[in-house]
Amino acid sequence: RYKLSRKLLTLGFRSLNEHNLLETVLPHLRDLRDQVKETACFGVLGDEKGIFIEQAQGHHTFRFVLSPGKPFELHCSAPGKAIMAYLPKTVRDRYLSYMTFTRYNSRTITSREAYLEELEKVGKLGYAMDNEEELSGVICVGAPIFNYTGYPCGAIWISGPKDRLSKEVVKNTVKA
C-alpha cells in the first residue's frame, strides 16, 4: 500500500502554483526581453536558495543561458534581494539563518548587517541590483512578483554585461 507524503504533496502543489504563475509571467518576460534586448529571467524561493524557473533569451550573440532548477544565491543576486526585501520578518529570518554570505569578489555583500541594509534600500526603491556582486562584469536588475495576497512569490530580472547595461538602460528597465 502506497500513499503520498506531505512533502510530496507540498512539492506537487508548489509546482502547480509555479506552473500557473509561469503562464502569467512568461509574456511579461518576453516583453521585458524585447524592450531591453537582454535575457529576462524568472525565479522563486526554494528551501534555502532561489530557484531559476524560466528565461526569455536576449537578442545578443553573447547572452546568459541558465538551466531550469538551477539555484541562485539570495545575498548577491538581484532576484534574491528583490524577494527577500518583501518577505515577512519571520520568514526572512529563517532564510537568513541558512545564509553563509559567500564572497565571490570584492563587491559581494558578506555580512548579515550589510545585507539587511541592502534589503531596506530595495524595499524603498522597489527593485534590486546585483552590481557585479557574484560575477565580475555582470549586472542584474530584478523586481519581486507578488501573489494575490501580496506575498513575494518570485522575481523577474534581467542580466547582462555591464558594458550593455548602462545607467540609462537600468533606469528604463526599472520603468518597464
Please report, for each region that a protein language model flagged, where it lies by residue.
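A cytosolic small-molecule/anion-sensing beta-strand core signal
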Residues: 6, 46, 154
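Short, solvent-exposed recognition segments
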Residues: 61-134
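Short regulatory alpha-helical segment in sensory/regulatory domains of signaling proteins that mediates
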Residues: 29-37, 41
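Short hydrophobic alpha-helical segments used for membrane anchoring or interfacial signaling
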Residues: 42-47, 56
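N-terminal helix-turn-helix
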Residues: 1-18, 22-23
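Extended hydrophobic
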Residues: 110-176
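Hydrophobic residues embedded in beta-strands of well-ordered beta-sheets
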Residues: 2, 50-51
